[in-house]
Amino acid sequence: MGQLRKIFGKIKVTLPIPHLLELQVDSFKKFLQEGVAPASRADVGLEGVFRSVFPIEDFNKTASLEYVSYDIGEPKYDMDECISKGLTYEAPIRIKVRLVVFDVDEETESRTIRDIKEQDIYFGTVPLMSEQGTFIINGTERVIVNQLQRSPGIIFEHDSGKTHTSRKVLYSCRIIPMRGSWLDFDFDHKDILYVRIDRRRKMPATVLLKAMGLSKQDILDYYYDVEEYQIDRHIVRRKVVENQYRKENAWVDLCLEDGKVIVARDKQITKFGWKKLVRGGVEYIEVDPKSLVGQFAFNDITDPDTGEVIAEAADEITEEIFERIQEVGLKDVKVLHTQGADVSSALRDSMMLDKTTDVESAQIEIYRRLRPSSPPTAEIAANFFENLFRSSDYYDLSSVGRYKLNARLNIETPLELRTLTNEDILTAVKVLCKLKDSHGPADDIDNLGNRRVRPVGELVENQYRIGLVRMERAIKERMSLQEVATLMPHDLINPKPVAAVLKEFFGTSQLSQFMDQTNPLSEVTHKRRLSALGPGGLTRERAGFEVRDVHVSHYGRICPIETPEGPNIGLIVSLTTYSKVNDFGFIESPYRTIKDSTMTDEILYYDATREVGHVVAQANAPIDEKGSFTNPLVTCRLNGDVSMHPREDATLMDISPSQTVSVSAALIPFLEHDDANRALMGSNMQRQAVPLLKTSQPLVGTGMEANVAQDSGSCVLAENDGVIDYVDAERLVVRYDDGVYPDTGGVKHYELQKWHKSNQNSCYGQRPRLPIGTPVKKGDVLADGPGIKDGELALGKNLLVAFMPWCGYNFEDSILISERVVKEDVFTSVHIEEFELVARDTKLGPEEVTRDIPNVSEEMLRNLDECGIIRLGARIAPDDILVGKITPKGETQLTPEEKLLRAIFGDKARDVKNTSLKVPPGIEGTVVDVKVFNRRSGEKDDRTRNIEDFELAKHDMKESKHIESLTNKTRVKIADVVANKQIAQTLMGRKKGEVLAEAGHIITDEILAEVPLKKLGGLFADKETNEAVKQLLAEYDKQIRIIKGIYDVKREKVTEGDDLPPGVIKMVKVYIAVKRKLSVGDKMAGRHGNKGVVSNILPEQDMPFFDNGTPMDIVLNPLGVPSRMNIGQIMETHLGWAALALGQKFAAMLDTGEALGVIRQEIKDTFESEDVYELIDSLDDEEFRLAVNKAREGIVTKTPVFDGATEEEIWDLVGKTGIGDDGKVTLYDGRTGDPFHNRVTVGVMYILKLHHLVDEKIHARSTGPYSLVTQQPLGGKAQFGGQRLGEMEVWALEAYGAAYLLQEFLTVKSDDVTGRVKMYEKIVKGDNFLEAGLPESFNVLVKELMSLGLDVNLLQDEVEETADKK
């Protein structure tokens, strides 16, 4: 049905928003690969884990356990059963393994296969994800939050001069694997390069390079260029090489061959002059003979005659060595190029500190540092070093780590090679040395290119791997202890370690969270959340400001607004609307590509690293029809900096202005006019909005509402095109076109949720939207969920608001509200409370659920049935009995007289005590559901049988509706086949002698409807037609058998009994619907962070009112706006008022009988936009009437974030309403009727009721439980506690000298046990004076002193004596 709506967005968005739960659902699908054939499964997820741990070989290599494939079975219970019975929704896994036994030849050590055994083994269960992205663990819905973690790979950073007192900037580099040892290289203040493995003691970096197999000379060759010198007696010349420029003065005039002087003597050689020399072909220049002194030999310098080593490679050339070189007459000397402008001798200096000489000594040195306790041999050390970085069993960079390493070091190692190579380490050290010598910037660890998301699939995969590794150890031990030849694979494999790890992860991990299920939005945002906390992540205490802060790379990937306000600020964030996570775990944002400064339709996703270097234009840059920029200069982003660029430079363009914010921030209209702090509160508070009894769409929305509602899984969506065949409050039957549900003929039966208790106790119910016979298209909303109206999110209500002070009732953000809101149930919400009673087998006998409870009046039992369980629909109040239960008491020894009396009168009341389930304080409501769970073998009571009969009748009805819909569909198919076909014989009707059609007649649709389907086979003259009809009927029979089979299984489940925990005989769950009306103390909020508490509910007649008598619904304090800077609420107020007034204006025109054509034209003139013209022209008269009638409550407007209605547009619409042009009116005081002095801003604002409800927080105690040790009353609502009178309150009473009051507070009202009893006796007798005793906490103090060895005695007698003397 058409709805009048005005969309203010001007930017056309070509890309639809990806499904909001895509990350969760796809990640788990990839992990499980459930529908994929074992042979074609990719080496990821579960398959990858099995392949990485298997094959498992024993220590002697005589047997090998190999993995073949796995298979996932069907879950035993469906999701609803798991929730109601408190079970985990999981499926069994079976793995196929092969045990290969070898014969080993002792001499040659070659192996021959002796035996192969293959077997299918049950391998425990794995929790399954629901379509909504949740897991059901022990009956509660949980969400695994995606973790945001430092990416494996390599990172170069510096300490900003904070480490050393000299303030010198020290550079370091770290190689982080997915699993294995961390490798750190860092410089100290003396420019020595050290290496640390696993953050142990540091050693010179060259130790590691030597351990890798490099000699001293190899290292120098790799890291340093060679400077060549020619020595001719006292003249020293240096070879001119282009990249060996250094700052120095010319020793002589430097000339070209033609004699032209390039650099005069004693003048500095510039870079330009050096290039001229190179280009002029100058080979050598004469330098200061002393310039060789202080340089380092490139290789060993030897005496050409004797072979004596004058200086070893890397040695410093001193004056003595220089003189020796001249003596022996060496002509050519090679030194390290370390004195250039951008090179240094750091690595050579590190080498000089290195005491190791070869590979062996270096490997032993590393072994000593990492395993200080055990003495090494060369073989052990070599083995240890090999396993450190080069063995895939111990070290795994992961494909992400390899990808990052390749990208940063600019190398091309294949992604499959996931261990460290020599090239990786050598290049890393080279890049680090260049970085230190100021080549390029260090990396930014907070950039999203260096942080990756670990989604559900990966987190579960890691847990599975941990479990399998534990199991692997056990298997190896078993293989070595027993004779493998006699064993079968199932003797070796015990899946318990894996099950234990999974159970622990899903049940207790920091990332496995109880789903926030207050409303559909809170579900969606919880599943899109990213957390930097959790195992392997940060901790709240250690996380600094930089990690929490917004980073330029967050643009379009992580929302800068939505994050918690407390200690977790910035550590828990949300994905933006359009972002995706790629296979490597990096967050990507979509951009449109620009070619030759013209927009193309190509859309590409870029992660933070790939985006570097691109000039990105904003989504709101003006564009002509051809897709070219209209302005010569465009606002663009380049590497995070915003500036103006020529339009030719732009290479990418944002998709949509809302791509920078998350889902809940994108639901705030005029977000661009709100201060960020308030927008944060606004987006967080929408998640706390309680779904209301009656829902209504916001008059001012953003266009995101439909996406959230439909992707949340709370609505029922059409899975294909089709027709609604049946609908009532509890079920929907849809007859789809062919393509879905082929087994049941394309007919789908939807069970609607009713009275479903969410995790936060809100009532989740679904309401059908469309009547029977409505054709539906794929993706249409068939039924609305909680807080959803017409397939769009509707969490609050549109209220008439006035911004004015009113007698101090809106002081400090308080809210004054009209009684109409309470009377008409505008903000009434329903909450479901669940109570559970368990009857167990005790040592003294079984507990019994019964109505026969000792010492309880008939009045208390009035709502219980004969089994002792409360009836459906009963109104209950605190302390009412919900389920009667008696527990056997310990038998006491009876006297013979008592035994006789008991035998005569049958008084068993003393044997049992009343342990019934009662309603706790503060809960009043109606019983909406009762579930009774019995042991499979146990006896069923009447109530259980009634419930079973009711459930069976429901299944019967469902089955009949399902079959009826299938029959209709088959009839339609047959009608198409037999159209215009003659029948071969006369067709008789249902009544006696009634003839429907004579032989030879053509059958009509009316006749066809009268004939049972079974009779249509072989009815026609045409053989082909008969064949086609028979085929359709055969298909119909098969489908009916399948449908009956489905419902038979369901019926069996109803009657089969339940698996209860050991010792439990019966379990009863009672569900109570509590209606919470709006009351003083409830917290309410708008969408702009404007929150407050209801301070007073005023009668309608006392509220401020318009001159036409309409009273306000809500009065807010105008002082709450300027300092908070959330101007969005004012713009929403004005636009909402215009939307309401215009809707009422059009409806009034309809009521006064105005011609429809005139109303159509009026609407077009008012809105002046193409989409409104199209909508008005597409509606026929009846649809148009309905649309205008619906607009009586206001015309829905959509103002997308950063692309919404401008101020001019709002004032334009307000002007067209005819009620003033500045949004202010004169209001009248409801109490006196006088006008207020000033005109008041009024309008319509969307207000939410948050789940901080006063009814759930308020509580009162007269007497109640006491603490065991101190005997003082407990604290808190959950314990039914009292209020604590602390030391400060005591000081206040002391200051006023209120001695008697103080005595009462500190004794009888607190912890004077005997005093309490005496007090009661005195009150009963009517004596009104206080006799206080000793507080119990004083005794506790005395006992504590005794524990310290101090004996404390109270001197009562002496005190009395002294009093007597006085």
Swiss-Prot record:
Source species of the chain: Maridesulfovibrio salexigens (strain ATCC 14822 / DSM 2638 / NCIMB 8403 / VKM B-1763)
From the Swiss-Prot or TrEMBL record, give the protein name: DNA-directed RNA polymerase subunit beta
Per its UniProt entry, what is the enzyme's top EC class, as one word? transferase
Q: How does it assemble?
A: The RNAP catalytic core consists of 2 alpha, 1 beta, 1 beta' and 1 omega subunit. When a sigma factor is associated with the core the holoenzyme is formed, which can initiate transcription.
Instruction: Report the PANTHER family cross-referenced here.
Output: DNA-DIRECTED RNA POLYMERASE I SUBUNIT 2
Task: Give the catalysed reaction(s), semicolon-separated.
Answer: RNA(n) + a ribonucleoside 5'-triphosphate = RNA(n+1) + diphosphate
The family assignment reads: Belongs to the RNA polymerase beta chain family.
Domain of life of the source: Bacteria
Q: Identify the coding gene.
A: rpoB
